């Protein structure tokens, strides 16, 4: 008998049918994969399961009992825990307080912090997570925060655990800890719904698989061993994708961006590099290698200690992002939710926010011009939405990334694009569309810096790769010399290479 059952679950929003009569079952003690393009309905299904949103129709059964909860709290008490891609921790509370939030150990109404911290410390050590429980969550890396979310599910003894892109911010070591935790939960009899775009992980961890497309059930595989990667990709996108990367050779111009001796608070060893007109330069390294820190220094988001930056031979001193933008340099940040999109605002507003000075006269906005621009970029970038007025938080990760790119494409005179983790949490179909946008920009002479923790991505789309390790430049590899083993070796922490490029 199935332990978890979705029966004709449907959910609609204004102009969009997110789920249409989705039905499938999952056995007890099974890791079940959930795949589909961004916008396929995966996140909506998880929200319905978690009680965050109510279904318009259909039923959910756990161990034969219909679930009629109407809130996240009800689902929580039913043994359902969801770990979202957008983490739900409270930044200003400690690790221990977050893990015990809503169920603090108390006596006579008094919370015993010492007991709280020591209990959490023992549990974290038991499951192999090396984090001080008295540390505030705000001081932790994204990867460490993800591990704390996962630890919460383990401590709650949940019956059903949904993990949404759980390794997107984890190092290799942290991912291995996660995989061992999943094995422990599986052995305990829990159902794990594993949402991921990483086929390697799906085939390694999952026993069965469901594929959604356009809110409908595209395929259900009770035994994942009986399917293939090619079949799954075809089921996801409804078409064959022979080459996701599609690298395109193009003529490169003179140096457009030159960086000499750049350093800052979290990038102690000065680094130097250049990017030519039309070139796509990749930065690869493990988590903590200093890639994102370099990008923030370059863009003026963080104060630099020293260093020279020139664009088309003109010296630029980006001590804040406004200066960088004025000089023609823009950044698509690593964390789309907190640093990229403006939550609670429409797609139109998010596209126009950096260029509104072009759509105003004497400080008065021109709504029709702004709306026309939004419609143009929604069509050009193939943003899937019923309306430009839709709140951007309701878009999938891939469509949010397109809107951020649209924002900068609307900025006149863009010369340098720095894009950090361009396709994190984005499905294979949307990845291909993002790469098309980057190739088009490069063909127009824009110098592009791509920062990615996915080696196949930088090898697939970049003309050159700079490998970073512990805040230093460890290697500079031209496309004819791309070799996965040598690039990974250069990224390992026991290397000490540094210098100019």
Swiss-Prot record:
PROSITE patterns in the cross-refs: ABC_TRANSPORTER_1 (PS00211), ABC_TRANSPORTER_2 (PS50893), ARAG (PS51268)
Any one Gene Ontology cellular component term annotated for this protein: plasma membrane
Keyword Endoplasmic reticulum set for record: no
Residues noted as binding ATP in the record, renumbered to the chain: 36-43
Pfam family, one: ABC_tran
Keywords attached to this entry: ATP-binding, Cell inner membrane, Cell membrane, Membrane, Nucleotide-binding, Repeat, Sugar transport, Translocase, Transport
Subcellular location: Cell inner membrane
Record SMART domains: AAA
Domain ABC transporter: 4-239, 252-495
Record's catalysed reaction(s): L-arabinose(out) + ATP + H2O = L-arabinose(in) + ADP + phosphate + H(+)
Keyword Cell membrane set for record: yes
PANTHER family given in the database record: ARABINOSE IMPORT ATP-BINDING PROTEIN ARAG, CARBOHYDRATE TRANSPORT ATP-BINDING PROTEIN MG119-RELATED
Protein name as annotated: Arabinose import ATP-binding protein AraG
Organism: Rhizobium etli (strain ATCC 51251 / DSM 11541 / JCM 21823 / NBRC 15573 / CFN 42)
